[in-house]
Amino acid sequence: MTKTRTLVPLALAVAFATNASAACLSDAQAAELAAHYLSRQPAANPEGLSDADGACSRAKLNALLAPRLGKVVGYKAGLTNPAVQKRFNTDKPVWGKLYEGMIEQSGASVPAAFGARPLFEADMLVRVKDAAINQASTPYEVLQHIDQVIPFIELPDLVVQAPAQLNGPGVAAINVGARLGVAGQPIAVPATRGERYALLDALERMQVQLTNNQGQLLASGKGSDILGQPLNAVVWIAQAL
């Protein structure tokens, strides 16, 4: 029997915003968004969506993308930084699906124009080992149900014409900008209680830097930027799904 492993990326900050009221994207609008995503061309902004509208629109988009992108291998959390949430007029994270074709391995080369509105972020993945993750309510409980923490350079794509005008539900509607990412060397979750608490502390206190090939600092962040502790994002995803 083959065991399915789920990857969960915990974005340091993918965020955006606006206001208004509209409805779930129509089938035609979702098809247009999917076509622009696949052709890497900016699409019209989904405007004025409620949380329910964003979730409905995300479902329509993913139904169209799945036949092209392969099986779902995990979920991503975005808008996980409270300061970013406030800046973009929302108070909660959002989630999207990751497909098998989105995950590259360390050393991969990716075109600079990999998306319509390409970005890069220092990030991390966790690999889920069993379904009991869905009952985890603390970071320590999360560690009991994952077997790897994986450094990850996420390469999201905001895909719309005016990314700064997206709100939280709008980010959900575009599947939280999921496009590509490069996974690094996995770190095994230790077996003993003491080592696991040490790992939790290290994840919260870690300093992450993204540099170019000349050593210039492009971006930086710390573990606590993700909901206070990175594995809180896993708890949130489990509850949101």
Predicted regions and their residues:
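Bacterial N-terminal signal peptides that target proteins for export
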Residues: 1-8
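Bacterial N-terminal signal peptides
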Residues: 8-19
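Catalytic-core "active-site belt" of small-molecule-metabolizing enzymes
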Residues: 23-229
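A conserved acidic, glycine/proline-rich C-terminal tail/linker
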Residues: 233-241
